[in-house]
C-alpha cells in the first residue's frame, strides 16, 4: 500500500498529488485527525463509527452506546431500553467502535432464532463480517484444522445452548467484548442449579460484556443481582448480603441506595422519552375466521386422538413433546403439510421393522417441510439444564412388531383421508383476507404488498400454486431456507446479471439469493410467502401487510414476524391478518391470549415489556399450550386449563415488580430530555465536521483519478493503470457516494454505487498511506479571504506570516487517547493560541518550496508551546483517571462492606437463636427435653465461637482481596506517553 502511494508521489510530485486547496501538510494532518482515539467521556468518541454505519441518528442510541464506554474500568453494561427502541443498533455501534479500534475478538450470544437477524443487521447496517457457529459449522472448522473456531477475525454469533456446550472454547478465547441478547434468560444465574447461566457466566468471567434486555427485572430483585454479577462480581457483595439488604420490603432510602449502585451498570430509555425523534406507526388487526369442512374436522380429530395416545412408536420419548407440537402445527397449517408428514412417519415405522436396532434420525421427518426444526429443537432445550439424550434403538418384541404394524395402518388411513381433501377452508378465506387487507392499505396510501407467513414448506408450495391460479400470476415470490425453486433461481440469475461488477454482490450465494428475492418482492411482486426460519434477519419496511396464515403459539415469534415490517423506518400503519379456526375451542383461547393479553396485533408498540418478559423466550408458554392440547379433551377441560394459564400469567406480571423497575431503572424528567437534545445537536455537529473533512481529504487525494460531484458528495474513481505498485488500486474503481448522516433515510443509492465511509477499504488505504508519508517542511499560503471561515483572530493575521507545528500525543493508561498538539507563532514573535492554529489548518492552502530557515529561537518557542500543552493535557488526563479510580474505589469499598455485613449478620443470627433456645429451655419442665435443648445450645455456642474467630480472618481476606483489586487498577494508572512529530511549515495568510 505504501509503495503505491510513494509511486504516486514520484510520478506526480506533491503539487499534482495534493490538490483541491489542501497541502501535503494539511492532508497528513487531517488523516491523523480523522483516525485519532478520543477518551470515553467524549461525545466525539463514536463519530467515526456513526459515520461508518448506515443507521439514522437517534439520541437515545448514541447515549446508550456512550454509556457502555463511560469508564475505561467498567466491565460492561446492561442496556435495558423498552422493546422497539433498537438495542441491536446500540450494540452495533459499540461493536463498530471495537472493530475500528482493532479489538476484533467479538462474540454475540443470542436466541437461536435471532442469529441470522444479527448477522444481517451487522452486515447491512455496520459492514461488519460475522460467522454463525452451530454444531455443523463448528465441526467443519475443526475438521479443517482450526482448533478453536471461536478464535477468528469475524464477529462470532452463537446460541445460548451452543455457548453452554462449547464453554471450554469460550474460556480459551481472549474476547474483547461479548454481547448477550435477550439477557434476561440469565437472570436466575444466582441459583447454583441454573447450569446454562452459570456455565456461560464462568466461561466469560473477566470479559467485558454488554447485556441487552427489555425486562431486567420481572419477578424478584434478585434477578437484578444475578444480571449485575454477570457484568461485575464486585458490584455487590455475595448473595447473602444482597438478600439481607434488598430482598425485603424496601423503603425509599433503600430504593435510592440500590438505584445509585445500579446507575453505573444499567441504562434504560422509555419509548415515551423519544417520541420527538422516533416516529411510530400503529398495528391494525384483521381477524379472518373459518370453519373446517366435515372431512377436515374428521382428519383433525383422528390425528389429534393419535397424538394423545400413551405410546407412539413413530415418535421418540425424549422429544415427543416437541415433535407432537410440530405435528399439531403442520396439522393446523394445511392437509398438504400433514399429508407429507404422515408419509414420512409411515416410512419411518416401515424402516424400523426392517432395520431393528439401527438408530434413525428424527430430523429427516421434518427435513423438507419444517425448516425450523433444528433451531426450534435447540431453543426448546435452551432453558433445560440437561438436554435429553436421544433414545437408543432397541430390538422389537413380537408384541411390539404387531403394535407397530397397527400404528402404520392407522397412519395410512389418515394419509388416505388427507389425500382426498383437495380444498382447504382456511385457504379459501385467504382471498377474502387479502382483499380486506389490500383495501386497508389503499386507504392508508401504502404500497400493495403482503407478507404471508407459514410454518410449512408444503403449505408454502400449495399457496403459491393457488395464488398463481387465482389472480396473482407472476406476482408471488417464495422465500425459504433453500430458495432453490425454479422461480427463485431465475430471479437470482437475473439479479446477478443486473448487478454484475458492483459491490451489491457479496460473493455469498445464500446472502445474495436472499437480497435478490427481497429486491424482487420490493420492485416486482405483490405477495411474498415466507417460512418462519427463512424470514429471520430480513427487513421489509416497504411492506405494510403481514398475514399469519399459520399462528405460532410462541408470542416472541409472532412479535418477530410482525417486526419484519413494523419496525423503525416503516412509514405506514401495519395491517396484521390472523386466521382462526372457530370450531376449535383451544385455538380460540390461544388467539384470545395472544390478542388480548399479549396485545400483539394492535396499538402502536405491540406486546408490552411486562408481558413478553413474563414468558421469557416463550418456549415454556408454548410447552404449556402444547400440554393443554395434549391432555384436555372436553371444552370444559380446555376452558379450565386456559383459565389457569391466564391466572398464572397475571401473577407473573407483578405490580410490585413494576414499581421496583420504575423506581430503580427509569428516569423521566426534563433534564433527561434536555440531555438527549443537546447530545444529538453536538453529535450532529461532530459528524458534519467529520464528513466534510473526509470529503475534502478524499477530493484532494484522488483529484487526478476521479470525477467528483460536490452537490451529492459522489465520485467516480477511474481504474488505475496496471503499473507494479499501483496495481493494488485496481480493486477500487467505480462510483461512490458519501451519504450524510442526516439524509440516510431519504437517500437511496443507485445500483452499483458504493457507500463511501471511513471504514471503506478505499478510505482506509488513503488514510494509512497519508499517515505513513514524511512531509518536508515547506512554505504554505493560507487563503482566509476566499474562505467561508469567520474568525476575528485570523482576520487580524491576514498579511502576516509565521511557523506552525503539529505533534500527536498518545497517552495510554486506563485507555488510549490521541491528542493533536498545535504550536503556532508569528514571525513577529506573537504566540497564536492552539485552537486558532486548528482553524488555520482548515483554510484553503497552497505550498511552495521553503524560502526561510527555521531559527533556533523559533524552534525553541514552538517546542516550549508543545511542552506546555503536553503538561496541561497530561494533568487533565491524570485528573480524569483519578476520578475513574475514585469510582472504582467506592465500588470496592461498598463490596467489602456488603460482604462484612453478611458475615456479621450470621453472628447476630446465631446470637438470636441461642437466646431463643435458652428461653425454650426455661419454659420446659421435662428433664430430658432440657438436656436436649442444652446440648443444642452448647453446639450453637461452639459454632458462634468458631464464627467469631473466623469472622476476623474472613474480614482480613476481604480486605486482602480488595487490596489485590486496587493494585491491579493502580498498575493500569501509570501513563505511557508517546509523542509523534507530524508536520512543520512556514505559513503566510492572505
State where each predicted segment sits:
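Conserved RecA-like P-loop NTPase helicase motor core
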Residues: 159, 473-587
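P-loop NTPase motor cores of the ASCE clade
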Residues: 350, 364, 654, 658, ...
Amino acid at each position: 500500500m505504501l509503495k503505491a502511494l510513494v509511486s504516486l508521489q514520484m510520478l506526480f510530485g506533491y503539487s499534482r498529488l495534493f490538490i483541491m486547496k489542501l497541502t501535503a501538510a494539511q492532508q497528513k494532518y487531517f488523516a491523523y485527525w480523522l483516525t485519532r482515539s478520543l477518551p470515553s467521556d467524549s461525545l466525539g468518541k463514536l463519530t467515526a463509527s456513526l459515520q461508518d454505519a448506515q443507521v439514522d441518528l437517534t439520541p437515545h442510541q448514541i447515549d446508550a452506546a456512550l454509556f457502555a464506554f463511560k469508564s475505561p474500568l467498567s466491565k460492561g453494561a446492561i442496556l435495558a431500553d423498552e422493546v422497539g427502541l433498537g438495542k441491536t443498533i446500540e450494540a452495533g455501534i459499540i461493536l463498530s467502535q471495537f472493530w475500528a479500534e482493532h479489538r476484533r475478538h467479538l462474540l454475540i450470544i443470542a436466541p437461536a432464532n435471532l442469529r441470522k437477524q444479527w448477522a444481517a443487521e451487522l452486515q447491512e447496517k455496520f459492514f461488519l463480517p460475522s460467522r454463525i457457529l452451530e454444531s455443523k459449522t463448528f465441526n467443519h472448522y475443526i475438521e479443517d484444522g482450526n482448533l478453536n473456531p471461536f478464535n477468528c477475525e469475524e464477529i462470532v454469533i452463537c446460541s445460548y445452548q451452543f455457548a453452554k456446550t462449547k464453554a471450554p472454547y469460550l474460556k480459551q478465547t481472549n474476547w474483547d467484548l461479548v454481547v448477550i441478547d435477550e439477557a434476561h434468560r440469565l437472570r436466575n444465574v444466582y441459583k447454583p442449579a441454573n447450569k446454562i447461566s452459570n456455565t456461560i457466566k464462568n466461561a466469560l468471567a473477566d470479559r467485558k460484556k454488554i447485556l441487552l434486555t427489555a425486562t431486567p427485572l420481572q419477578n424478584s430483585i434478585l434477578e437484578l443481582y444475578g444480571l449485575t454479577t454477570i457484568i461485575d462480581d464486585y458490584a455487590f457483595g455475595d448473595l447473602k448480603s444482597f438478600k439481607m439488604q434488598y430482598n425485603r420490603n424496601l423503603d425509599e432510602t433503600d430504593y435510592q441506595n440500590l438505584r445509585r449502585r445500579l446507575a453505573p451498570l444499567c441504562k434504560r430509555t422509555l419509548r415515551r422519552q423519544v417520541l420527538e425523534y422516533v416516529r411510530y406507526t400503529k398495528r391494525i388487526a384483521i381477524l379472518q375466521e373459518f370453519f373446517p369442512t366435515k372431512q377436515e374436522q374428521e382428519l383433525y380429530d383422528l390425528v389429534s386422538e393419535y397424538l394423545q395416545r400413551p405410546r407412539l412408536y413413530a415418535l421418540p420419548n425424549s422429544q415427543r413433546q416437541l415433535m407432537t407440537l410440530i405435528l399439531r402445527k403442520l396439522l393446523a397449517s394445511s392437509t398438504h403439510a400433514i399429508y407429507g408428514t404422515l408419509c414420512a412417519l409411515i416410512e419411518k415405522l416401515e424402516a424400523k421393522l426392517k432395520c431393528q436396532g439401527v438408530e434413525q434420525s428424527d430430523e429427516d421427518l421434518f427435513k423438507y417441510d419444517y425448516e425450523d426444526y433444528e433451531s426450534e429443537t435447540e431453543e426448546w432445550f435452551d432453558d433445560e439444564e440437561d438436554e435429553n439424550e436421544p433414545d437408543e434403538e432397541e430390538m422389537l418384541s413380537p408384541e411390539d412388531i404387531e403394535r407397530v404394524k397397527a400404528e402404520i395402518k392407522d397412519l395410512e388411513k389418515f394419509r388416505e383421508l388427507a389425500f382426498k381433501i383437495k380444498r382447504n377452508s382456511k385457504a379459501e378465506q385467504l382471498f377474502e383476507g387479502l382483499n380486506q387487507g389490500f383495501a386497508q392499505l389503499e386507504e392508508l396510501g401504502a404500497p400493495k404488498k403482503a407478507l404471508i407467513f407459514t410454518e410449512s414448506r408444503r403449505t408454502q408450495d400449495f399457496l403459491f400454486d393457488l395464488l398463481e391460479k387465482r389472480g396473482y400470476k407472476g406476482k408471488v415470490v417464495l422465500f425459504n431456507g433453500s430458495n432453490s425453486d425454479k422461480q427463485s433461481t431465475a430471479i437470482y440469475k437475473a439479479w446477478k446479471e443486473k448487478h454484475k461488477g458492483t459491490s451489491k454482490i457479496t460473493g455469498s450465494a445464500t446472502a445474495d439469493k436472499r437480497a435478490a428475492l427481497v429486491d424482487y418482492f420490493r420492485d416486482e411482486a405483490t405477495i411474498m410467502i415466507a417460512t418462519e426460519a427463512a424470514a429471520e434477519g430480513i427487513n421489509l419496511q416497504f411492506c405494510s401487510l403481514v398475514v399469519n396464515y399459520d399462528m405460532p403459539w410462541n408470542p416472541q415469534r409472532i412479535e418477530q414476524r410482525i417486526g419484519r415490517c413494523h419496525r423503525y423506518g416503516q412509514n405506514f400503519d401495519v395491517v396484521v391478518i390472523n386466521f382462526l379456526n372457530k370450531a376449535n375451542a383451544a385455538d380460540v383461547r390461544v388467539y384470545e391470549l395472544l390478542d388480548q393479553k399479549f396485545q400483539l396485533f394492535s396499538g402502536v408498540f405491540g406486546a408490552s415489556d411486562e408481558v413478553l418478559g413474563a414468558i421469557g423466550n416463550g418456549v415454556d408458554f408454548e410447552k404449556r399450550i402444547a400440554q393443554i392440547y395434549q391432555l384436555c379433551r372436553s371444552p370444559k377441560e380446555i376452558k379450565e386449563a386456559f383459565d389457569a394459564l391466564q391466572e398464572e400469567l397475571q401473577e407473573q406480571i407483578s405490580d410490585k415488580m413494576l414499581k421496583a423497575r420504575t423506581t430503580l431503572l427509569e428516569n423521566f424528567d426534563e433534564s433527561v430530555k434536555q440531555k438527549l437534545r443537546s447530545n444529538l445537536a453536538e453529535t450532529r455537529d461532530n459528524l458534519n465536521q467529520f464528513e466534510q473533512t473526509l470529503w475534502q481529504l478524499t477530493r484532494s487525494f484522488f483529484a487526478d483519478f476521479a470525477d467528483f460531484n460536490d452537490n451529492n458528495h459522489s465520485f467516480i474513481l477511474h481504474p488505475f493503470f496496471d503499473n507494479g505498485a499501483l496495481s493494488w488500486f485496481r480493486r477500487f474503481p467505480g462510483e461512490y457516494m458519501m451519504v450524510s448522516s442526516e439524509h440516510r433515510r431519504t437517500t437511496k443509492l443507485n445500483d452499483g454505487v458504493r457507500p463511501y465511509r471511513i471504514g471503506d477499504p478505499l478510505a482506509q488505504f488513503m488514510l494509512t498511506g497519508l499517515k505513513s508519508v514524511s512531509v518536508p517542511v515547506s512554505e504554505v499560503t493560507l487563503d482566509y479571504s476566499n474562505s467561508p471561515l469567520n474568525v476575528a483572530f485570523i482576520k487580524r493575521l491576514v498579511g502576516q506570516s509565521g511557523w506552525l507545528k503539529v505533534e500527536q500525543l498518545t497517552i495510554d493508561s486506563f485507555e488510549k487517547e490521541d491528542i493533536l498538539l498545535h504550536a503556532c507563532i508569528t514571525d513577529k514573535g506573537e504566540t497564536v493560541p492552539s485552537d486558532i492554529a486548528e482553524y488555520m489548518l482548515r483554510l484553503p492552502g497552497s505550498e511552495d518550496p521553503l524560502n526561510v530557515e527555521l531559527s533556533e529561537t523559533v524552534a525553541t518557542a514552538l517546542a516550549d508551546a508543545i511542552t506546555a500543552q503536553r503538561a496541561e493535557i497530561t494533568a487533565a488526563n491524570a485528573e480524569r483517571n483519578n476520578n475513574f479510580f475514585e469510582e472504582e474505589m467506592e465500588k470496592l469499598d461498598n463490596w467489602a462492606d456488603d460482604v462484612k455485613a453478611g458475615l456479621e449478620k450470621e453472628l447476630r443470627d446465631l446470637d438470636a437463636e441461642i437466646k431463643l433456645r435458652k428461653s425454650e429451655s426455661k419454659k420446659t419442665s421435662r428433664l430430658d427435653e432440657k438436656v436436649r435443648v442444652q446440648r443444642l445450645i452448647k453446639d450453637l455456642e461452639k459454632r458462634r465461637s468458631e464464627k467469631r474467630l473466623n469472622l476476623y480472618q474472613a474480614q482480613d481476606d476481604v480486605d486482602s482481596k480488595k487490596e489485590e483489586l486496587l493494585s491491579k487498577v493502580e498498575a493500569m494508572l501509570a501513563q505511557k506517553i508517546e509523542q509523534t512529530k507530524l508536520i512543520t511549515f512556514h505559513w503566510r495568510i492572505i
